[in-house]
Regions:
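Sequence context surrounding c-type heme c attachment/ligation sites in exported
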Residues: 22-36, 41-44, 66-200
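Short linear sequence elements within intrinsically disordered, low-complexity coil regions
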Residues: 12, 50-51, 102-105
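N-terminal post-signal-peptidase region of extra-cytosolic proteins
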Residues: 51-66
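Sec/Tat signal peptide C-region and signal peptidase I cleavage site
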Residues: 15-20
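Positively charged n-region of N-terminal signal peptides that target proteins for export
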Residues: 1-5
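Generic detector of short alpha-helix boundary/capping microenvironments
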Residues: 8, 60-61, 118
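Bacterial N-terminal signal peptides
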Residues: 6-14
Length: 200
């Protein structure tokens, strides 16, 4: 009986500690980001959880109904753009998501910029301005049926970027299909950059 009481007491003490850990995001550095295909594939994007709560992140990402993501969730469609769910109250405007724009190479990741409503990607789009259009139940996460505006890259292009992430160990050469998709993407980026007003 004494052993059972002690066991219950230890569990009761451990639960608040576990809950506290789940409610605070781990420190985020360049080492927090890795080869995109080493993350968990959900439909056409990849997810992870910096707090170790990957099962819950995958469950929410796989749901069609929409609900808040757990703290520590990492979402990526392409290697250079990341969303990380921070602790509750970190930034109410972005529903506690922090946006990251990365440079990636064989040696790893470098954070080009990070923040909230001010972060833009290399295609010229403001991350928050796109994601804020997602319907409320989808926790600021875009998909083709979530209410966000269409993005200028196709599934073939995002897939090619995922499969050619330089941080990954590539054991096969780039396919003709991926090479063609990347060429098309390069033309789109060139056109977007050409349409930008000249900097003063």
């Amino acid at each position: 009986m004494k052993i059972s009481i002690l066991f219950v007491a230890l569990i009761a003490l451990a639960c608040p500690i576990a809950n506290a850990a789940d409610s605070h995001s781990a420190p985020i550095t360049e080492k927090s980001f890795k080869c995109i295909t080493d993350m968990t594939h959900v439909r056409h994007f990849y997810v992870d959880n910096l707090n170790g709560n990957l099962k819950e992140t995958v469950r929410v990402a796989s749901s069609d109904k929409g609900e808040p993501y757990p703290v520590g969730s990492v979402l990526q469609l392409v290697p250079t753009e990341v969303m990380v769910k921070r602790e509750k109250g970190f930034n109410p405007t972005t529903k506690d998501w922090e946006f990251f724009e990365l440079d990636v190479s064989k040696t790893g990741s470098t954070i080009r910029t990070r923040g909230f409503v001010e972060v833009s990607n290399r295609f010229g789009g403001n991350c928050f301005n796109c994601h804020v259009k997602a319907r409320p139940e989808f926790d600021l996460v875009c998909d083709v049926t979530h209410g966000c505006d269409p993005i200028p890259i196709t599934r073939a292009m995002s897939g090619a970027l995922q499969r050619t992430d330089p941080r990954c160990e590539h054991k096969t050469p780039i396919s003709d299909e991926d090479a063609a998709a990347l060429t098309q993407l390069g033309a789109i980026v060139k056109a977007i950059n050409a349409a930008k007003p000249p900097t003063q």
